[in-house]
Structures are given as structure tokens and as C-alpha cells.
Amino acid sequence: MRIIETHRDLLSRLLPGDTVGGLAVHEGQFHHVVIGSHRVVCFARTRAAADRLPGRADVLRALAGIDLGFRTPQPLSEGGAQGTDEPPYLVLSRIPGAPLEDDVLTSPEVAEAVARQYATLLSGLAAAGDEEKVRAALPEAPANEWQEFATGVRTELFPLMSDGGRERAERELAALDALPHLTSAVVHGDLGGENVLWETVDGVPRMSGVVDWDEVGIGDPAEDLAAIGASYGEELLGRVLALGGWADNGTAERISAIRGTFALQQALYAQRDGDEEELADGLSGYR
């Protein structure tokens, strides 16, 4: 809770009505997120992440004008401008709910309900990707996205790996060569379980909203499907694919290739941001 002690006075002002000592903190890859009863405060972990905060707020404002069928955080205020003694921060509205508990999907009824809501979410993102105003507001994945990623990994991360780690990474990068350039849907970019919030209604989870839109863009929906599989396993992913009409070999191959890069993605972003903790975690299987 060091982040709370460091910014106690500021948090008292930004989160009126909350007891600072009782606040929870979520440690994300790019931000420390302090969670109040009605608002959350995002503090950047690194200088690079701080420089991206204004752009993050702009993206959330753009999303607010799109009917996605679920709630997204609304920017309320920003701080830490150059020339002030405040740390860079972004205050957002809080989406009620929490990530799913690890054991909740053991119930077939619950697993089916969760899969249906994920299929609805992804169908909504795909439909939004067809809207001209949405495509104008969000960045489109570049045609050479994965080639640039592979170059970055080889240049910046290979020197930090063991021989066996480089061999593993080469296999994972080789799988990217066959990926087509698709820009058919709004892609969240980090749709892991911690970023999808749920409330329980009559004993069944109901999706309340989606947070952490730092990497949103127009791209391949297989990226979000890969994150669902990494969070919840192949059985739930299979249900989502069947419900959404995506259970074809091409989609499965794209999901597998993208999922194989998740640790490398974490490590490369951390290396560029100067975040040693996230870098060490991402490279733990390559050293």
C-alpha cells in the first residue's frame, strides 16, 4: 500500500467520502489503480506511461460516444501537469463489480452464462468496428504490426535471454508469420479476466463493464479471444467460439499464435517503459 501512503493527501482530495486507509490498490502493467467507492485514481508506473495518460483519457471519451452495450470508465479529471508538484494521474468513474472468482466456472450454468455474455461483448465490438465514426476515433493496427513486434523482441529482448529462451521465442515469433492483416473489429487489446467486471444477479454473474482500454484499436478479434482463453482455459473459449460462430480452424490458429506472444508482449512493453518488475516477470520463462 506504499502508493496510498505516498499520495495520502492527494487521494483524500480526489476521493472525497472514502477513508484513505481502507482503499484497495490494483497493480496493473502500466498503472497503480487506487479504487474508491465511486471513483478510481490511476497513477502511472513509469514516465512513459505518464506521457500516455492524456491519450488514454481521449480514448475513453471516444468510447463513451459509442454504444458498445456495456459500461466503460468515464474520465473525470487529470492532474500532474508539468510545473506542478503533483504526480501524473487520471481520475475515472468506477464500474461496479469485480473479476470472476477462480472457481465460479465449475458450475455448467454459470459457465454457459459467462460464455454467452463474452460472445455478446465480442459481437458488439465487431459491430462497432463497422461504424465509420468508430474507425475514425480509434487507431488501426498497422499492416506490419507483428513483423515490427518480432524485430523489437529480437533486438531488445534476445540479449536478456538464455539460449533456450531465444529458441523458445523464435518458435513463438515464427508462428506470427502466417497471421493475416485483419482490421474487422474494435479490439480491447488486454481482455484478460482482471479487466472484465461482473456482478451477481440471482446467483449468476452479469457483466457490468470492461476497464483498462489502453491498447484499444481496430484489429483482429483473435487478440481478445486469445486473452479469454489465457484467463479461463480452453473449455470456456470453446463455448465462446461456438456461440459467436468463430469455431473455424483459421480463427483457432490465429488465437494460438497470438496467445503464444503474451509474455513477450509484456516484456517488450516493460523494457521500453523501463519497468524492471514487469520485465522480469515477462521474461521469467526465457532466462
Swiss-Prot record:
Protein name per its UniProtKB record: Viomycin phosphotransferase
EC number: 2.7.1.103
Reaction(s) the record says it catalyses: viomycin + ATP = O-phosphoviomycin + ADP + H(+)
Organism name: Streptomyces vinaceus
NCBIfam families, alphabetized: viomycin_Vph
Keyword set, alphabetical order: Antibiotic resistance, ATP-binding, Kinase, Nucleotide-binding, Transferase
Cystines in this chain: none
Family designation: Belongs to the aminoglycoside phosphotransferase family.
Domain of life: Bacteria
Gene: vph
Lineage, opening ranks: Bacteria, Bacillati, Actinomycetota, Actinomycetes, Kitasatosporales
Active site: D190 (proton acceptor)
Gene Ontology biological process terms in this record: response to antibiotic
Molecular function via GO: ATP binding; viomycin kinase activity
Function as written in the Swiss-Prot or TrEMBL entry: The aminoglycoside phosphotransferases achieve inactivation of their antibiotic substrates by phosphorylation.
EC category: transferase
InterPro entries xrefs: AGP_Transferase (IPR051678), Aminoglycoside_PTrfase (IPR002575), Kinase-like_dom_sf (IPR011009)
